[in-house]
Amino acid sequence: MAKLNTKHRVCSRESSISSLLASCSLSGSSGCSSDGSFQYKDQLYSSASEALQAYIDDFDLSRGHPGANTDKVNIDGEVGNGPHFSSCVLTPNNALANLDDKRHFNPLYYRRETINDMDSISLTTDDLLRLPADGCFSFSHVTSDHRQKKKSKKYIGRQDSLDIKDSPSFYAPKSKDNTLPPYVYTNINGKKCGDKIELLILKAKKNLKQSTEDLAKPVEKDDSPCSLDKLEAERTWENVPVTFKSPVPVKADDSPQQNSRTKCLEDFLNDCNQSSTLSGGKHHGPVEALKQMLFNLQAVQESFDQNKSTEPEERRKQVSEDDFSKLQMKENMIPITRSLHKALQHLSRLRDLVDDTSGRQSPKM
């Protein structure tokens, strides 16, 4: 043990010994020896450090050889069989006789007394191994009455935490930050519940049950939109009836002039379709259209010549004016007549050219 202590921590000999073995008390004895000597394995040591060093050497031998045993370091000469140091502070029967009542009930007084009187504290081997390297550690005076109360509180807390499962309701006071303070769980009777982990588990289970019940209730009342029946049902919002109204002609009550124009256009288109069948094809070319125009003009001219020979000149003037007015009306009514008028002009020029060429050729003959 001494080798391990030198390897893992470096500290002074006096500080470690004074902190580790400030005092040694016996579990079976009621006091300390008057001469202040320490006995270990039938040997008396004048100081605690020598007894502790002997104990450490035996402990190292016992670790190397499991068959070896170590005894207790005793003050009054008793020898034990196990490496056990008493962890409780023992006082003589008349130790509190001369103390004042205020000192007896003041924990700070006992804390100062234990720190000042280091010989009244004993440690076990495990406690010695857990000490820091510098050897300093803090002590707190714990009386036997306090330990008994603490054990009873622990037992009551465990019993109450187990009984909480059977109790129908319990509450846990919360702080300002909505956090549960440790060991402040109480039930209806006001008893403290020490085991907060079980309370949290029970509370979580209760919340889960409530959430599942709340989710199950609306599903039972109203059908879920994610169910197969709802998905396979007809979607009324997609089959919206659409009413189609018959088209209403715009400006149905037009003037009689527009009606006459539409009739003239229809008649002209019908005549064009009939002439295209006579010319030998539905889609006639421009030459065939000119031929049709020439034929029509020749027929009009022949009829005009016949009327000219029979009627007087005044009648001719009236007829020419009427024809001219009719042509103007046709030009105004049908836009296509403009192109026809231009074609007539071209044809008249062609006819004049033909007549001129024929007149020039006749004198030569």
Swiss-Prot record:
Might play a role in cell proliferation. It is found in: Secreted. Keywords: Phosphoprotein, Secreted, Signal. Residues 308-328 have a biased composition (Basic and acidic residues). One of its GO terms (biological process) is negative regulation of cell population proliferation. InterPro entries: Cell_Prolif_Regulator (IPR052679), LAS2 (IPR031587). The modification Phosphoserine is found at residue 161. The gene is Las2. This is Lung adenoma susceptibility protein 2 homolog. It holds the Pfam family LAS2. Its main location: secreted. Residues 304-328 are annotated as: Disordered. One of its GO terms (cellular component) is extracellular region. Residues 1-31 form the signal peptide.
